[in-house]
């Protein structure tokens, strides 16, 4: 199997705020960075201070001082379903448009190896691009050669990309954003020139090959892929593109309100709105994309959307948009000493918010930001990679962002149950490592990786833990949890001593078959107690609880390795082993990192597959800070610390695992390494990295090439082609998800039901603050100043017992209800304080004898950001290149 080396692998709305005066100033944010007066919000009868979110976010706006001349460098906007990269090539402001459900589905008669089969290359289900919108005239208004000034800004608080350009030839002022109701993209455009010129607003669609395996194999003869079924159209007020794909169709419609124009169809792929020559064009473009799965008449539906937007008018839509985003940002915050990482946190959260409200979760590679026609690396849903962007969203108090992912995975259940029978001849459900949007799974090459289903089930369980949404648990989470647990019940074998074993599986993506793989054991130890608790909550399956408990209590223990030496001959302490090899084999450098080491059947393994030995820590949470002082905790720490820097990869999780174990400095070291290697795109996107340290999978220059094998007549040949690597430059979501998750875990942990504040801060981080959500639907606001934790504010969204590890170990805790001022009884056991909460109430938690004051609010470090930021050689934004 080849992959990734294998793997080249809260809460009233704030008052509506006026628009920024230009792309490079924020009129509502003081330039000196002085904080605006703190406001108050009310939630469930709770009044509490609130920071100036606008000022906090303005610090982190992404600023371009030069035009983005490549789509991949564009600023991301969207309505949560339809998105665009806004970029500024010399010919004019351009929007590369995508949508969450533009699926070109594969035929039903797919083979078991459809994911990697050469015969199936360019036939597999693909999320294709939407269209390109360009506003152009006959002058090079945005050519750097003629620019006097240029500023573009991603205004995070307002969720707008703003452009302001000046040259001797004229000026461009534009603002683009996504409007969730009625579901349109909006471009506000004002262009002036020194002489009368005609302008064209062009809408085009040119499909292409997908190049899922760009690094390994491709079909040079498939150049007609994506070109068929496209038709451009126009009426006096609209232009559009329609395309019929293999199973669905879609339409993209644009309407312009402003300067007079006429429409024309240039060819089957392009339609335009053309103005008469004038020295100024002013107006708004409204654009909608609709598929036949949303409406049987997508063209008419898309037309209705843009007409509704035009009828409401720009100012009304923008006011509504601003209110929605003010409310969005009021849900959470964090502030840490590393401003650059904090900036990436907010940018990553924004990017997910503008793309993860659609029918499907955005694919991890490219997301809804593919810049080059339909080309997309790793075009399927890969379970581990697809989870990572969603790891942080519940703690960030945005569980709504996980809805598309949760829905997709729960709707896959029937297919996973079928594949459990077909592939493994077992009951329950087996989720494969790789699937398409219909849940059709890879049934060869990855069949011995048994953990995806249970890890997916635990994603759903985590969503319940943070939201306490009983209906979600009943309808979506528990059925998947139960079915995946049943698969393991059928798969496990019991030995003569009554101990249950996993007889044969692989650890994550390893090709090595093992017994008692640590990934399976970790998944079972997490999921079986979760199934028991879920069945108790729902009042079902009492008889199954007995079975789950019996297996859990008699499951084989994790195995360890060492002390000794690893495959590379390096001395190591006692660490976790991935399992016991079931075969004799000799390692290779490509797969195992070292050449020629002989492994014998029955030998314990270590360091063989994607740091799988850390699975007991994360994502399973079987070992964490609650286990401090135990042998297994110490082994976990040594295992994490033994991870080589080369393994600090964008798609792995040692940073999160380090934070879970309280290793704040190590977590920071890893996330710094990952950011340096993988955050190469100027708008703050991460890309894949490569096996070579400090070498992201991103074209170093225009002549960098990939050399895949050529496929002819459905067969892979020994011939190799040279494809420009820049064709495949695109963002990858895992790095941002991992960064967010790591920072969340450094500031707040609650995965085991106990709230721990600042559990993994680096030694140098004396000051930090946050408002994040904890398991049990508690919203926690905390500030640490000069190394001292201030009183905490805990809001109970659903009621229940709050369990909190005392952040002042030498002092006793007092809890006071904020609204009434009454004291609340507190019970303490082994350093864990417990008190009962009421839904909608907020509580101050503070040491007895200290003032009962709310935690200090974060203050902006400076005013609105005016320039690109640099850090350790990385940059957010774009410097001036003229």
Question: How would you describe each model-predicted region?
Answer:
Residues 5-27:
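N-terminal export signals
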Residues 29-72, 77-379, 399, 409-418, ...:
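Acidic/polar, glycine-enriched structural segments that form the non-catalytic walls/loops
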Residues 136, 730-780:
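Catalytic cores of secreted or luminal carbohydrate-active enzymes
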Residues 180-189, 776-803:
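Carbohydrate-binding surface patches
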Residues 197-205, 795-809:
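Surface-exposed beta-strand/loop patches in extracellular or lumenal glycoproteins
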Residues 382-415, 438-439, 445, 449-470, ...:
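Active-site core of glycosidic bond-cleaving carbohydrate-active enzymes
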Residues 483, 487-537:
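Acidic/histidine-rich catalytic neighborhood
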Residues 805-821:
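Solvent-exposed beta-hairpin/edge-strand motifs
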């Amino acid at each position: 199997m080849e992959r990734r080396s294998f793997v080249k692998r809260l809460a009233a709305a704030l008052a509506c705020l006026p628009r920024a005066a230009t792309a490079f100033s924020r009129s509502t944010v003081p330039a000196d960075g002085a904080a605006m007066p703190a406001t108050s919000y009310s939630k469930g009868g709770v009044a509490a201070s609130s920071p100036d979110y606008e000022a906090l976010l303005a610090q982190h706006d992404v600023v371009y001082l030069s035009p983005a001349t490549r789509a991949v460098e564009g600023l991301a906007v969207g309505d949560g379903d339809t998105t665009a990269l806004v970029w500024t090539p010399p010919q004019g402001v351009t929007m590369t448009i995508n949508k969450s459900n533009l699926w070109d589905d594969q035929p039903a008669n797919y083979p078991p190896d459809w994911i990697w089969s050469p015969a199936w290359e360019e036939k597999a289900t693909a999320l294709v691009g939407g269209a390109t919108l360009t506003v152009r005239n006959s002058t090079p208004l945005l050519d750097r050669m003629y620019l006097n000034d240029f500023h573009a800004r991603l205004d995070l608080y307002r969720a707008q990309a703003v452009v302001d350009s000046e040259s001797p030839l004229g000026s461009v002022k534009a603002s683009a954003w996504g409007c969730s109701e009625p579901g349109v993209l909006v471009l506000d455009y004002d262009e002036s020139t020194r002489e009368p010129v005609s302008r064209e607003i062009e809408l085009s669609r040119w499909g292409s090959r997908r190049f899922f395996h760009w690094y390994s194999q491709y079909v040079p003869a498939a150049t007609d892929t994506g070109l068929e079924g496209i038709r451009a159209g126009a009426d006096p007020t609209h232009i559009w593109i329609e395309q019929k794909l293999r199973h669905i169709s879609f339409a993209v419609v644009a309407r312009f309100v402003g300067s007079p124009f006429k429409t024309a169809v240039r060819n089957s792929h392009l339609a335009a709105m053309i103005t008469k020559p004038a020295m100024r064009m002013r107006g708004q473009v409204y654009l909608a994309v609709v598929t036949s799965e949303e409406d049987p008449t997508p063209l008419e539906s898309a037309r209705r959307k843009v007409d509704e937007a035009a009828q409401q008018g720009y100012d009304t839509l923008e006011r509504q948009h601003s209110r929605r985003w003010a409310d969005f940002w009021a849900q959470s915050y964090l502030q840490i000493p590393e401003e650059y990482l904090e900036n990436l946190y907010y940018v990553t959260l924004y990017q997910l918010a503008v793309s993860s409200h659609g029918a499907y979760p955005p694919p991890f590679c490219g997301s809804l930001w593919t810049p080059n026609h339909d080309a997309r690396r790793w075009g399927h849903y890969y379970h581990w990679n697809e989870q990572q962007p969603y790891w942080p969203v519940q703690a960030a108090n945005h569980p709504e962002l996980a809805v598309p992912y949760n829905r997709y995975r729960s709707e896959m259940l029937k297919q996973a149950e079928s594949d459990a029978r077909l592939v493994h001849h077992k009951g329950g459900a087996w989720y494969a490592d790789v699937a398409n949007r219909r849940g059709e799974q890879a049934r060869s090459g990855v069949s011995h990786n048994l953990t995806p289903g249970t890890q997916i089930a635990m994603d759903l369980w985590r969503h319940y833990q943070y939201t306490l949404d009983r209906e979600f648990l009943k309808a979506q989470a528990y059925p998947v949890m139960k079915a995946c647990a049943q698969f393991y019940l059928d798969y496990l074998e019991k030995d003569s001593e009554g101990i249950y074993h996993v007889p044969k599986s692989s650890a994550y993506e390893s090709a090595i078959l093992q017994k008692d793989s640590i990934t399976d054991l970790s998944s079972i130890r997490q999921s079986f107690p979760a199934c028991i608790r879920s069945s108790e909550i729902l009042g079902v399956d009492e008889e199954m609880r007995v079975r789950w408990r019996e297996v859990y209590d008699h499951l084989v223990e994790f195995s360890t390795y060492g002390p000794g030496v690893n495959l590379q001959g390096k001395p190591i302490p006692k660490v976790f082993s991935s399992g016991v090899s079931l075969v004799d084999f000799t390692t290779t450098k490509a797969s195992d990192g070292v050449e020629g080491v002989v492994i014998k059947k029955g030998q314990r393994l270590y360091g063989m597959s994607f740091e799988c030995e850390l699975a007991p820590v994360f994502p399973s949470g079987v070992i964490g800070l609650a286990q401090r002082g135990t042998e297994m905790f110490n082994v976990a720490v040594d295992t994490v610390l033994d991870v080589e820097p080369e393994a600090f990869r964008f798609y792995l999780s040692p940073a999160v695992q380090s934070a879970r174990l309280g290793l704040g400095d190590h977590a920071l070291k890893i996330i710094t390494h990952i950011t340096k290697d993988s955050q190469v795109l100027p708008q703050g996107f991460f890309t894949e990295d490569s096996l070579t340290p400090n070498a992201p999978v991103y074209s170093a220059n225009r002549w960098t090439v990939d050399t895949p094998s050529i496929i002819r007549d459905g067969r892979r040949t020994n011939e190799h082609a040279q494809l420009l690597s820049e064709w495949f430059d695109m963002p990858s979501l895992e790095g941002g998800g991992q960064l967010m998750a790591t920072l969340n875990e450094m500031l707040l942990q609650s995965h085991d039901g106990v709230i721990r504040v600042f559990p993994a801060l680096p030694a140098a981080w004396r000051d930090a603050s946050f408002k994040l959500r904890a398991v049990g639907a508690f919203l926690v606001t905390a500030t640490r100043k000069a190394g001292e934790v201030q009183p905490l504010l805990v809001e109970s969204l659903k009621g229940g017992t709050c369990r909190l590890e005392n952040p002042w170990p030498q002092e006793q805790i007092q809890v006071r209800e904020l609204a009434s001022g009454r004291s609340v009884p507190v019970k303490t056991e082994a350093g864990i304080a417990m008190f009962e909460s009421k839904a909608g109430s907020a509580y101050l938690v503070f040491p007895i004898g200290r003032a009962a004051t709310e935690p200090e609010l974060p203050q902006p470090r400076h005013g609105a950001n005016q320039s690109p930021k640099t850090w350790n050689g990385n940059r957010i934004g774009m410097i001036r290149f003229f």
